[in-house]
């Protein structure tokens, strides 16, 4: 289905996994392990060896078949070649945590355009770049590929946020209130997957019974309105659109590249 490779993967590769504590590449790997992901986990680090008790593969090309999702945390200049390697292996789901794209302007914008084109050309789906990651609390999945401060308790809400900071803040607040989530998607620069993609996916996902959206830009307002009108007849939707003032829009552009 639309986002199954990302939200319900059977195997996850962490490209840019690290042995160094308190780095994103190490924290993400540990969170996958500690949350009890039900599938296989493959760290990728050019030095190889072992990371958090798992064999580290020196490149994506070394990975076994059957990887659904690659969580990419390498430097932005290496992301395109990493995506090429993922495509060659048949990996269809990508979460690009790495920053350094449209939010930096100029060359970063061009790099993101090339990234999005490569994803489309290979029939892949991508969350990000410049995002916190994704979570699925379903006990048969147990996916925590996210570096938000708080992990939501299990529930029936699907939550998508363009802002990493605000998304993480909402998770903190609602965790304190014991409000549970089924799935969380931090879309970041939304070069591919956006709020509309999430709405379409969650429309028929039995795990998600309520939908919460925080958006700073809507690429196709007419299509969003059409989707939201249709889906809200089945599941309640709460949507917050920020950045309405000129000052707010400027601030949002520098944080998550909202257009």
Predicted regions, residues:
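Catalytic-core regions of core metabolic enzymes
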Residues: 1-255
